[in-house]
A protein has these predicted regions:
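C-terminal target-recognition/interaction regions appended to catalytic cores
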Residues: 21-194
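Rossmann-like dinucleotide-binding core of oxidoreductases
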Residues: 1-13
Length: 194
């Protein structure tokens, strides 16, 4: 996605150069942690979780929590429930036996994230229509959950301890609407050095 900037008269007679590309390969390994918050049990008919590389599943084999469908703060997101449990969806003449895929998006479903890679773009609508899901395994089997606000915040480039205001939905909207802080920092540093 291109970014456009207008610098008014600050750059008259000067040439702005964007920072050099960073060559490190970002991934989600140090960001996404085990948590059963909002997790839903995934059965083999929902998705064959054994097809996901073992290193991509966040595990705590001592944990014996199960999904909590009664506590509104711990219930799986309704969009996750639909994408994980509804079968045989037809879209533009193509039948999808399930609506989940690992490491890539399908037009009608959600993506089980590959923590070895960077995240797809986080947008403000993730609060009401999440499409990126974390694969989990504990004593009771396999689960999926949405990315949590603290994880989304770090994916977007905010420090782990950065404070947001409002409830969980407002946090996600703020994160999704934000320009990544590392990008702004590099641009400002280049502006200052002009």
């Amino acid at each position: 996605m291109p970014y456009y900037f207008q610098f008014a008269d600050l750059t008259v007679g000067r040439k702005f150069e964007f920072p050099n590309k960073i060559n490190e390969k970002p991934n989600l390994k140090d960001i996404v942690k085990f948590s059963m918050e909002g997790a839903i049990k995934i059965n083999p008919e929902d998705y064959d979780m054994s097809t996901i590389p073992s290193e991509c599943i966040i595990k705590d084999l001592e944990n014996d929590e199960d999904e909590d469908l009664n506590d509104k703060n711990k219930k799986p997101h309704p969009n996750l429930v639909v994408l994980a449990k509804k079968r045989d969806y037809v879209y533009k003449g193509v039948e999808y036996p399930n609506r989940l895929s690992f490491g890539k998006r399908i037009p009608v479903g959600g993506e089980i994230i590959d923590i070895r890679k960077p995240s797809k773009t986080i947008i403000c609508t993730y609060a009401r229509q999440p499409r990126l899901f974390v694969p989990l395994q504990n004593k009771n089997g396999y689960y999926l959950r949405c990315l949590l606000p603290d994880e989304l915040k770090q994916i977007q480039g905010f420090p782990k301890d950065f404070k947001l205001s409002g409830n969980k939905t407002k946090h996600i909207v703020q994160i999704g609407n934000a320009v990544p802080p590392p990008l702004i920092q590099q641009i400002v540093q280049n502006l200052i050095s002009m």
